[in-house]
Amino acid sequence: MSKEIFIGIDGGGTKTSTVAVDSNGQELARHTSPCSNYHSVGEDLAKAAINEGIKYVIRKVKETITDDDNKEVTVGSICLGMSGVDREKDKLLVKSWVTELLGESINYSIHNDAIVALSSGTQGKLFGVVIICGTGCISLGFNREGVSGRSGGWGPLLGDYGSGYQIGYDILRHVLKAKDQVGPKTSLTQVLLEKLQLTKEEDLISWAYDPKTQSWQKFAQLSPLAFEQAQLGDEISNLILVDAANALYDLINSVIKKLGLDKEEKFPLVYTGGNIERKGILSDLLSKKIMENYPNAEILNTTCDPSMGAALLALNSKK
């Protein structure tokens, strides 16, 4: 009798994590391969990264089977959570890679990374709301009927208010307003210049517009300064985080209303992303506003990584 496994894949912008679990959800094997976002690395490298992970975990599971006469492994289901895969043609492309390797009959699902993040907090159940606040931000959810809703995720140029990028941008904005004497002084000025190893505010122009380092991440990497200085009593830093909490609440509120979750006796709300999954001023501000308006929300942090969240979705799809 062959051993049945369930595979979850988290295809992020920097790496691809693949996990195999058994029918009880116990982890059997894990592998990390390069980026599988084909918009970033191209189709060939993305396909190779996904195939590498699948082949590795199957091989490792086979190595653990003690029955020398039967080392067969059957993939009961596979679930992929992929960044940059939202359109139908993207999903069909990735599906073709998987079915080429595992066969057309494979039980298969593909979701964007927000859905897998929700599963990481709900142990594989697609019910409730997730708010992701990293470099960008998005809220997504499902009601009991399986209807989905989302808000945000438009990217820094079109929105992402409340995101790490926006917090970093607001730090720069307030530092320069203080320099121009059109806004109050802030302790962010000194710590920002120290972090970037600059001597004066005018140097921020070349830092911000340097074509060699143009990325949303470099703005988001400034966001910890607001957390640190708010903790030390800086009013501007606290204001930035209050604005961020209000923006994140608006995303969550929109999804709750769209899905009618306000009428539920209780629903899970999963926090994930570096800016809110750790306890701190932003998560406290957000939680306070949530509980004032939705006392039926059960605020959760993720209990496993996204690849395990995907594996649990794969497992639950067979139940």
From Swiss-Prot:
Task: Explain the purpose of this protein.
Answer: Converts N-acetylglucosamine (GlcNAc), a major component of complex carbohydrates, into GlcNAc 6-phosphate. Also has ManNAc kinase activity.
Positions bound to substrate: 37, 113, 153-155, 160
Q: Name one Pfam family in it.
A: BcrAD_BadFG
Q: Which family does it belong to?
A: Belongs to the eukaryotic-type N-acetylglucosamine kinase family.
Q: In its keyword annotation, does this UniProt entry include Transferase?
A: yes
- What is annotated about its quaternary structure and interactions? Homodimer.
PANTHER family according to UniProt: N-ACETYL-D-GLUCOSAMINE KINASE
Main EC class the enzyme belongs to: transferase
Does the UniProt entry include the keyword Kinase? yes
* Keyword line: ATP-binding, Kinase, Nucleotide-binding, Transferase
Species this chain originates from? Dictyostelium discoideum
InterPro entries attached to this UniProt entry: ATPase_BadF, ATPase_NBD, Euk-type_GlcNAc_Kinase
**SUPFAM superfamilies, alphabetized:** Actin-like ATPase domain (SSF53067)
Catalysis: reaction(s): N-acetyl-D-glucosamine + ATP = N-acetyl-D-glucosamine 6-phosphate + ADP + H(+)
The UniProt entry, under Gene3D superfamilies, shows: 3.30.420.40
> Can you name this protein?
N-acetyl-D-glucosamine kinase
Question: Which E.C. number(s) belong to this protein?
Answer: 2.7.1.59
- Its encoding gene is what? nagk
Annotated ATP binding lies at 14, 135, 220
Q: Give one GO term, molecular function aspect.
A: ATP binding
